[in-house]
Amino acid sequence: DLFNTLEASYCIEAAYHNFPKATIHIIGVDSERVGDTQHIAMQWDDHYFICADNGILNTLIQKKIPQKIVAITIHDRLNTDVCDMDVFVAVACHIARGGLLNVIGKEIPSLKPVSVLTSSITDDLSEIKGQIVYIDSFGNCVTNISQKQFNDTIRGRKFEIVIKNKKFSRLHKSYSDFPVSDVKQLKDLEGDFLALFNENGYLEIAIYKSNPKTVGSAATLLGLHFRDTVSIK
């Protein structure tokens, strides 16, 4: 989705650490500079991120304080017909040459406050509520409920994950984490639903060996969509 900043935010958080320090990440999702939405460059966790200040990076700064954020100010130095990505590329080239952020922008104290979907925990720690923030090409549905939230709230007690009319009372360690025997082999479990915390530490609802175009997926078979609610009780 070219304008889904929440989905992009999850993908960035999940992917950036697979790149070496000092990598420059150009983010072209909903990148137009309009109104109070500035173009920004941010140094965070020794990586550089260039994008519009539209909420995409707000999840990152909740986890760690940025090293520096600047509002990009080089637009009047470029040709009048340049697009947003041309600006981002010019900034990236400057950084790649060892240039300082203050040369291409004015330092700002923080990102623009933007309302984003966040998971929540009830005061009595009886329930976690979250939403689907990403659906991958296999139709697996990733939520914004983290494993840390789960561990801190559930604390080893019995639980029930509820999403639409489907309930889970067990977490799988991997996609193939099913009990097998001489009677029931792993191949016989293809199409079974499962819930697990993915490699990025977020709760995911999936189907073993799903295929949205043939046998179906968690998204298609359960009718799940972006922003749908999931709860753990």
Question: Language-model segments: what does each one mean?
Answer:
Residues 14-16, 38-40, 60, 79-80, ...:
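A generic local secondary-structure boundary/capping motif
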Residues 78-155:
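Anionic-ligand-binding alpha/beta catalytic cores of soluble enzymes and soluble regulatory domains
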